């Protein structure tokens, strides 16, 4: 009986160690990309362009979904990666996007952002 309790405890600890990191960051890059997809044309547009309403809806949805520090860091890393893959990215528009959508995020959307410093 004592041996089976030890095995059960060991199994529980192993499950906690394996599952905990997966639960930390609930946001995937797929989710971030889907929310931000309507913004690509704005991010490639000349300065002073206005983001389309579906873009701002995606920005607000992403902000609402990023409720923890790991979520915000995951979103930041996904945005940083996406910014690096958009041809002809207008970095001024990328940096201005949250403000133009009426929200505030604690970092600049840029390929040089240090996402490890992002906190909730």
From Swiss-Prot:
Gene3D superfamilies: Plant lipid-transfer and hydrophobic proteins. The keyword Transport applies. Expressed in roots, stem, leaves and tendrils of the mature plant. Residues 1-25 form the signal peptide. Residues 120 form a propeptide. Keywords: Allergen, Antibiotic, Antimicrobial, Disulfide bond, Fungicide, Lipid transport, Signal, Transport. It holds the Pfam family Tryp_alpha_amyl. One of its GO terms (molecular function) is lipid binding. GO terms for biological process: defense response to bacterium; defense response to fungus; killing of cells of another organism; lipid transport. Disulfide bonds join 29-78, 39-55, 56-101, 76-115. The keyword Nucleotide-binding does not apply. InterPro entries: Bifun_inhib/LTP/seed_sf (IPR036312), Bifunc_inhib/LTP/seed_store (IPR016140), Plant_nsLTP (IPR000528). Belongs to the plant LTP family. Plant non-specific lipid-transfer proteins transfer phospholipids as well as galactolipids across membranes. May play a role in wax or cutin deposition in the cell walls of expanding epidermal cells and certain secretory tissues. Binds saturated and unsaturated lipids, jasmonic acid and lysolipids. Has weak antibacterial activity against A.tumefaciens A281, C.michiganensis VKM Ac-1144 and P.syringae VKM B-1546. This is Non-specific lipid-transfer protein 1. It comes from Pisum sativum.
């Amino acid at each position: 009986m004592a041996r089976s309790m030890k095995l059960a405890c060991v199994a529980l600890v192993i499950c906690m160690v394996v599952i905990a990191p997966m639960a930390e960051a609930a946001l995937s890059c797929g989710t971030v990309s889907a929310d931000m997809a309507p913004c690509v044309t704005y991010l490639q547009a000349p300065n002073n362009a206005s983001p389309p309403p579906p873009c701002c809806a995606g920005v607000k949805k992403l902000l609402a979904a990023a409720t923890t520090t790991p979520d915000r860091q995951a979103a930041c890393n996904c945005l940083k990666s996406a910014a690096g893959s958009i041809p002809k990215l207008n970095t001024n528009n990328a940096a201005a996007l949250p403000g133009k959508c009426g929200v505030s995020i604690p970092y600049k959307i840029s390929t040089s952002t240090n996402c490890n410093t992002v906190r909730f």
